[in-house]
Amino acid sequence: MASQGQRVSWGDESTKRRGRSNSRGRKNNDIPLSFFNPVTLKQGSKFWDLCPRDFVPLKIGNKDQQIGYWNRQIRYRMVKGQRKDLPERWFFYYLGTGPHADAKFKQKLDGVVWVAKEGAMTKPTTLGTRGTNNESKALKFDVKVPSEFQLEVNQSRDNSRSRSQSRSQSRTRAQSRGRQQSNNKKDDSVEQAVLAALKKLGVDTEKQQQRARSKSKERSNSKTRDTTPKNENKHTWKRTAGKGDVTKFYGARSSSANFGDSDLVANGNSAKHYPQLAECVPSVSSILFGSHWTAKEDGDQIEVTFTHKYHLPKDDPKTGQFLQQINAYARPSEVAKEQRLRKARSKSAERVEQEVVPDALTENYTDVFDDTQVEIIDEVTN
């Protein structure tokens, strides 16, 4: 095999399944960690007979590195001194990594099954193995997984950790309650002793408490601080929208002031989505240093114009809310639509009433009809 590696081609591969050699693999306690969760094999099945030859997990490495091997983990449990075998686990490692990092592709090793994607390079990868502090990844494949294979998940470790944390938290809460009850008893006795000492000194604690409550009540009854923006003596471009209608500061919506629907204009910064909309507006420094500015005389004033372009993320929900406010004044509101619909329905009902044939000209037919037969009489006599 060339030192630079060759492309994998399964075209000349025999259809006969790969078997095991008699050489022994390394013991489990020496095995580096795989990037992926293991495959558990049903008892009685043989992994090397069932494993597709391109059974390489997705998501790691480039197309040249989709090559490696599945390494067997033999498992058992001791029950009353007797060994009870458990289903085998198989872990995937990339070529040049793991317990058989020095092995060549297709080298016969006990408990090893080689796999590769068509066109992968038969030279060692540099992908390494998983660190001890990292979680293993879920297995995903672009080929059919044999029904005898069970792709394991990390539930057992998470559940074990959760149960351990729950037990620890329960013990902590119980200890905390015990300490708190003990501390409360001590605090009560200390408080009583202090009150008795103050009373002997002539200090009336009840009157002091009443005065404190009275001051607190006075503060609560005092007027709340007015947070309404002071806009009277400010230029239009320095005014701040408060709660309520903003047209008195910025005028009605038009082609030159085209932002805001009826709710936003009527309620100002108390509108439902105002905080989200404000997050989509550039900062002062962004406008100052990231805009194109022009100025010209306009009578006794200077007219200043700036153009600012920026981008909002398309998949952000706030962006959708922001875009709905642009030119909203030119679109009919939902309230106006509903009013027009009600008005149209009312007019339609009036027309129907006007078109009803007078009772004197209709045939008085009182037969009872079933659900499938209806006779309509629409004959008017002169």
Swiss-Prot record:
Q: Could you tell me where the Basic residues compositional bias lies?
A: 17-26
Q: What domain of life does the native source organism fall in?
A: Viruses
- PTM field: ADP-ribosylated. The ADP-ribosylation is retained in the virion during infection. Phosphorylated on serine and threonine residues.
- What name goes with this protein? Nucleoprotein
Would you identify the family this protein belongs to, as annotated?
A: Belongs to the alphacoronavirus nucleocapsid protein family.
CoV N CTD domain: from which residue to which, for each copy? 224-337
Q: What does this protein do?
A: Packages the positive strand viral genome RNA into a helical ribonucleocapsid (RNP) and plays a fundamental role during virion assembly through its interactions with the viral genome and membrane protein M. Plays an important role in enhancing the efficiency of subgenomic viral RNA transcription as well as viral replication.
Q: Which organism is it from?
A: Canine coronavirus (strain BGF10) (CCoV)
Region Disordered: start and end of each range?
1-29, 151-240
Q: What keywords were assigned to this record?
A: ADP-ribosylation, Host Golgi apparatus, Phosphoprotein, Ribonucleoprotein, RNA-binding, Transcription, Transcription regulation, Viral nucleoprotein, Virion
Give the taxonomic lineage as stored in the record.
Viruses, Riboviria, Orthornavirae, Pisuviricota, Pisoniviricetes
Query: Region Dimerization: which residues?
Result: 231-334
User: Phosphoserine occurs at which residues?
Assistant: 9, 156, 254, 256
